[in-house]
Amino acid sequence: KIYAAMQNYEPSVTINGFVETDIPKLMSAINLDNPHLFFVDFHYELQSDLFSQTVILKYIYNKADTVILTEKVKKVCNKILSKVTGKTEFEKELSLHDILARNVLYDDVAKDNLLKFHARSNTILGVLFYKTAVCEGIAKTFKFLLNALDIKCIVVKCKATDDLSGNEKFERFGNT
């Protein structure tokens, strides 16, 4: 229900059957599993009563801008994906990894100010348009590209042990 509301640019969505503490986990799962929702600001507001929670949704871009950005995303992705045509599934994964590793820089500026740079560095837009992102943006882009090739995977959020900064990785599912 929340995912559908986001896709339709609804300002809010009321859900039943969830406790308030489950909403952040649900929102995080939607965020990490749907990199194409780059236009959603996952810093939401929550209104609760005894029987339901209303999630007040926020958007980074309006519908018109999202349509334009989505077309640009498709063009860039098609260019990248054309480089892995004819390869095995494993070769595609490795090639995409190498393409991202060679062409994307870690965004140290955004790392120190994630709220200010979130729309760019934590989404696929940072990688595809600016060639810079933090771990989350890079992992989401890798997932986005793999999913476009019908290779199933997920983004897993974890904490590094040395500095407790958030890091993302992806887990794939398949035969190879």
Go through the PLM ranges and name each one.
Residues 1-90, 94, 98, 102-105, ...:
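N-terminal accessory/pre-domain segments preceding catalytic cores
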Residues 86-89, 93, 107-117, 154-158:
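Surface-exposed patches in mature extracellular/periplasmic domains of secreted proteins
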Residues 103-134:
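Short, conserved helix/loop micro-motifs enriched in His/Cys and acidic residues
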Residues 137-176:
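Hydrophobic/aromatic-rich core segments of domains that either
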Residues 89-94, 102, 122, 147-154:
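Loop/turn elements at helix/coil->beta-strand transitions in domains of secreted/extracellular proteins
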